[in-house]
């Protein structure tokens, strides 16, 4: 867990919302070692998740997936397995959901953190560490049809115009942070 705490501590924050989410995450990490999901859908609550936002470096376009369970357009990602390092989880989820070698992680750690109540009857809190991966949008993907209805490349303009209802609620803030760091 100390590796997770270091990742959270070292993450620069974008705004007051991310600062609040980081403070909650630190308090949570200080209060328990039980941070990995052990049973579906929500044990323990909260639990650790990774997102991987895939970006085409040539165009800046972002790949999102129409997630079957959440009903939202989301980045690739998923739950961190017990004892797994979040960066290892991000790389694993990327391969499982988009097919190897769909994309490669950029940098050596997460870029963003969110504390988000999920939607639906089994609502719980996902503490999400957001990573970035690079991919060429012209290359075909072998995405997981069991998990997603579809995958789609979105231009930044289209996302900023639409990234509210039907999308991961913090996506536009993540993109603002990413744009500020590049």
Predicted regions and their residues:
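Active-site segment of metal-dependent pyrophosphate-handling enzymes
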Residues: 99-139
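Acidic, metal-coordinating catalytic segment for phosphate/diphosphate chemistry
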Residues: 13-51
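Short, well-ordered beta-strand micro-motif
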Residues: 54, 132-134, 152
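Charged phosphate-binding loop/patch that engages nucleotide di/tri-phosphates or the phosphate backbone
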Residues: 169-182
């Amino acid at each position: 867990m100390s590796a997770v705490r270091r990742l959270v501590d070292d993450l620069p924050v974008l705004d007051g919302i991310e600062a609040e989410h980081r403070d909650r995450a630190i308090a949570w990490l200080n209060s328990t070692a039980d941070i990995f999901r052990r049973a579906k859908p929500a044990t323990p609550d909260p639990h650790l998740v990774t997102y991987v936002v895939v970006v085409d470096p040539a165009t800046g376009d972002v790949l999102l997936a129409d997630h079957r369970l959440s009903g939202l357009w989301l980045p690739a990602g998923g739950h961190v397995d017990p004892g797994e390092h979040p960066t290892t989880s991000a790389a694993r989820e990327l391969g499982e959901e988009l097919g190897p070698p769909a994309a490669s992680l950029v940098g050596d750690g997460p870029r963003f953190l969110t504390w988000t109540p999920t939607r639906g009857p089994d609502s719980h809190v996902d503490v999400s560490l957001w990573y970035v991966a690079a991919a060429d949008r012209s290359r075909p993907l072998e995405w997981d049809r069991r998990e997603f209805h579809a995958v789609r490349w979105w231009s930044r303009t289209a996302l900023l115009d639409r990234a509210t209802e039907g999308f991961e609620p913090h996506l536009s803030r993540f993109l603002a942070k990413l744009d500020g760091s590049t």
